[in-house]
């Protein structure tokens, strides 16, 4: 897909520490995907992996209303102040897990929010972690599905996707 899909913002959020906004980035790194040696490996890897897809209204991610009920969670959840970890910024979504060696075929309605603290700020981390939240408000109160295999835990209140920014400090290169 293009790095500037129609109808999506070209900038994410606003910086709190510096002026400006973070440039939006929707694509895989072209230096990797266009490399003749890496491209076939990437394509095969994508076919071999299970796919977790989540869907929500575009406005749930990118609305510019700075309001916990209607604001876009990808661009407005802001830094953690006190106990502010994005709980009021959960949006309805649908998640689907398909394919992979396990032959997954699962769909569930859920809540979607950004995961983390300062990693939610666009100037600190250009791509964010998400959290799928299973509450009766959005669908079933829990996800009961053997994501990790038959002999592993299979009941979840939430799943964190792309968790990073743990013991690191990742910033854009501002050169």
Model-found features: residue ranges?
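Phosphate-handling architecture centered on phosphoinositide signaling
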Residues: 1-175
């Amino acid at each position: 897909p293009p790095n500037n899909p129609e109808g999506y913002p070209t900038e994410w959020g606003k910086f709190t520490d510096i002026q400006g906004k973070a440039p939006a980035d929707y694509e895989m790194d072209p230096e990797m995907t266009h490399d003749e040696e890496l491209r076939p490996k990437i394509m095969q890897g994508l076919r071999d992996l299970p796919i977790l897809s989540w869907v929500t209204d575009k406005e749930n991610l990118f609305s510019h209303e700075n309001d916990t009920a209607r604001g876009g969670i990808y661009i407005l959840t802001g830094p953690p102040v006190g106990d502010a970890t994005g709980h009021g910024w959960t949006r309805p979504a649908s998640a689907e897990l398909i394919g992979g060696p396990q032959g997954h075929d699962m769909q569930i309605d859920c809540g979607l929010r950004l995961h983390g603290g300062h990693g939610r700020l666009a100037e600190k981390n250009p791509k964010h972690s998400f959290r799928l939240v299973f509450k009766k408000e959005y669908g079933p109160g829990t996800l009961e599905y053997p994501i990790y295999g038959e002999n592993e835990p299979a009941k979840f209140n939430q799943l964190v996707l792309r968790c990073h920014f743990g013991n690191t400090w990742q910033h854009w290169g501002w050169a």
